[in-house]
Regions:
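Conserved ABC ATPase "signature" C-loop
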Residues: 220-221
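H-loop/switch region of ABC-family ATPase nucleotide-binding domains
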Residues: 202-203
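Pre-NBD coupling/linker segments of ABC/ABC-like ATPases
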Residues: 2-40
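A short, surface-exposed alpha-helical micro-motif characterized by mixed small hydrophobic
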Residues: 208-210
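The feature captures the beta-strand-to-loop junction immediately N-terminal to the Walker
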Residues: 57-59
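Conserved ABC ATPase "signature" region
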Residues: 26-27, 121-138
Length: 226
């Protein structure tokens, strides 16, 4: 049985830099060879085995976030193939997807349901999510009354407690105050130890070394070290 849970095969991602919307529309029906291009990923190949914890490092614009967005289905390759086996939780845009008029607790059910969890399973983890977010009485107040930090705490808590097969993290450890960041860090390490596959983008080499057992170094859309 194959242990590969993530596979990138000759993956290329091109962003076309149009001058305006009119030009973008005109090129829907003809070749884009004359349009200025930004190659975010250039024929990337790598495999991730179940249970691996991988740090993805590189300068801004190296292609790190593009890889994470492909794993989470936010964007797709221009060429090549990406294969994902298992459910994915993403600590990317932690505050995205909340309904402002719904309470924090109601949003727990909504966001968890959208990840594919059953109502019974959500009930099982509800207390864990509430306790980890540590929002007190605000958990039953509308999200519109939350600060951005409170929304990020709740978003982190939901994604970290659904126990995914694959956890994708993009600098999420900057959430909240020092004590909450420490709690987040410890939770991620416990998930790694339990066998969750983790892909972690960070500018902190110390965090990568503590969490990850493998590092992929990207430069200008290419893997230069794995």
């Amino acid at each position: 049985m194959c242990d590969n849970i993530i596979k990138f095969e000759n993956v290329k991602k091109i962003y076309y830099l149009y001058k305006n919307e009119k030009e973008q529309f005109s090129y829907l029906f003809k070749s884009k060879k004359n349009i200025k291009q930004h190659i975010a990923l250039n024929n990337i190949n790598f495999l991730v085995n179940k249970g691996e914890s991988i740090g993805i490092i590189g300068k801004n614009g190296a292609g790190k976030s593009t890889i994470l967005k492909m794993i989470t289905g936010v964007t797709f390759p221009t060429e090549g193939k990406v294969t994902i086996i298992g459910n994915v939780a993403a600590l990317l845009e932690l505050t995205a997807g909340f309904v402002p008029e719904m309470t924090g607790r109601e949003n727990i059910y909504l966001k968890s349901y959208l990840t594919g969890l059953s109502e019974d399973r959500i009930k099982e983890i509800e207390d864990d999510i509430v306790d980890f977010a540590d929002l007190g009485e605000y958990i039953d107040q509308p999200i519109r009354t939350y600060s951005s930090g409170m929304k990020a705490r709740l978003g982190f808590s939901i994604n970290i407690n659904i126990k995914p097969d694959i956890l994708v993290i993009d600098e999420a450890l900057s959430v909240g105050d020092a004590s909450f960041r420490k709690k987040c860090h410890e939770k991620i390490i416990s998930l790694v130890e339990s066998g969750v596959t983790v892909l972690y983008v960070s500018h902190s080499i110390d965090s990568v070394l503590e969490i990850c057992t493998r590092v992929i170094y990207l430069k200008k859309g290419n893997i230069v070290y794995d």
